[in-house]
């Protein structure tokens, strides 16, 4: 698993281990956020039973414990996610620079300066954002939601299905858009590289452009490249928004199906009001983080282009050879050397 994460997200071995820790901490943090929901459920149950007065201290202590647990889990999640991410960021940049120093020169013949500069700067920055904001939150939300979903079936399987059917459908919509998003992002990257290459070329040849009075013609072509990047950026964002927006709209249908199925079962007497109330609370708590998870999933898919570019360099074969050189038979010897001027003044005589 660690090896797969290393190639998937261009991580070091330690970075992959830290990524797993960040996912676990995000999962635990999300589960702890359900503690207030559980307290509210038991509060309503005791209130309806008429014995709330005997358990005031229990709920006060429960609120304090929940507050402490949320604070501790958030602190651990922050350290496991953000601090480790930026430590890994430094390792990634140094490793990338060392790799560029050791790989064969034939690799650089296939790349231009703007491409390599973008890989070192922009791609690394994009993967930093993905590692700190998108990936741990996405996997943590999926794992915690799966655990909560399993627990819902122990209360009422019909209500659980009504609440959860929208989750796989929503993720399937965003997941199936992966090829479209990757295609759009690859084209966007090509246009960005062409634009960056044009700007770099302009800076290097600005004197020649002025000498031949071709600034206006060159700037027209460069302006066209910039506009092409802007236009395709709109298309890329729109393509992502169509899938994410559609999946979020379907996610909202879960609240309606829970209310509808719960109302029917309640009218038939097959469901008590307390369980109905609990499911309404749970779906309101689950769906909001899952909307963010859908955006994170789209962002993770989009960052696959940058990850592939980094992995191309990090996985490239290193130039073979030795780090030390042994000089055998190449000594320069200064033996019996003499030197004098034409006037006969001797400067050196039999010097070794």
Q: What spans do the regions from the language model cover?
A:
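Transmembrane helix-loop-helix hairpins at lipid-water interfaces of multipass membrane proteins
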Residues: 19-73, 153-158, 270-273
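Membrane-integrated ABC transporters
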Residues: 1-33, 52-59, 77, 81, ...
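Primarily ABC-family ATPase nucleotide-binding module
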Residues: 314-352
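Cytosolic ends of transmembrane helices, especially the final helix of ABC transmembrane type-1 domains
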Residues: 214, 238, 285-313
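Hydrophobic alpha-helical segments in the permease module
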Residues: 59-74, 167-171, 240-254, 273-295
């Amino acid at each position: 698993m660690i090896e797969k994460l290393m190639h998937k997200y261009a991580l070091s071995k330690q970075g992959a281990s830290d990524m797993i820790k960040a996912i676990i901490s995000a999962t635990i943090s999300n589960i702890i956020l359900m503690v207030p929901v559980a307290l509210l459920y038991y509060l309503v149950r005791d209130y309806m039973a008429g014995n709330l007065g005997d358990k005031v201290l229990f709920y006060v202590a429960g609120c304090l414990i929940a507050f402490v647990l949320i604070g501790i889990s958030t602190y651990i999640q922050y350290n496991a996610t953000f601090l480790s991410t930026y430590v890994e960021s430094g390792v990634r940049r140094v490793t990338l620079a060392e790799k560029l120093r050791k790989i064969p020169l034939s690799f650089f013949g296939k790349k231009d300066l703007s491409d390599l500069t973008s890989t070192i700067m922009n791609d690394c920055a994009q993967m930093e954002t993905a590692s700190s904001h998108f990936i741990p939150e996405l996997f943590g939300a999926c794992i915690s939601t799966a655990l909560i979903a399993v627990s819902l079936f122990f209360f009422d399987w019909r209500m659980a299905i009504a609440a959860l059917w929208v989750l796989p459908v929503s993720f399937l919509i965003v997941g199936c858009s992966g090829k479209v998003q990757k295609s759009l992002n690859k084209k966007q990257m090509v246009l960005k590289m062409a634009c960056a290459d044009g700007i770099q070329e302009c800076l290097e040849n600005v004197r020649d452009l002025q000498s031949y009075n071709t600034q206006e013609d060159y700037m027209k072509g460069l302006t066209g490249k910039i506009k092409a990047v802007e236009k395709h950026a709109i298309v890329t964002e729109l393509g992502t928004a169509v899938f994410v927006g559609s999946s979020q709209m379907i996610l909202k249908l879960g609240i309606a199906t829970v209310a509808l199925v719960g109302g029917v079962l309640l009218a038939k007497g097959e469901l008590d009001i307390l369980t109905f109330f609990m499911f309404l609370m749970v779906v309101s708590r689950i769906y909001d983080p899952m909307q963010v998870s859908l955006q994170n999933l789209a962002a993770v898919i989009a960052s696959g282009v940058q990850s592939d570019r980094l992995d191309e360099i990090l996985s490239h074969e290193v130039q073979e050879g030795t780090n030390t050189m042994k000089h055998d038979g190449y000594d320069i010897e200064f033996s019996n050397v003499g030197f004098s001027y034409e006037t006969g003044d001797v400067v050196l005589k039999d010097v070794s």
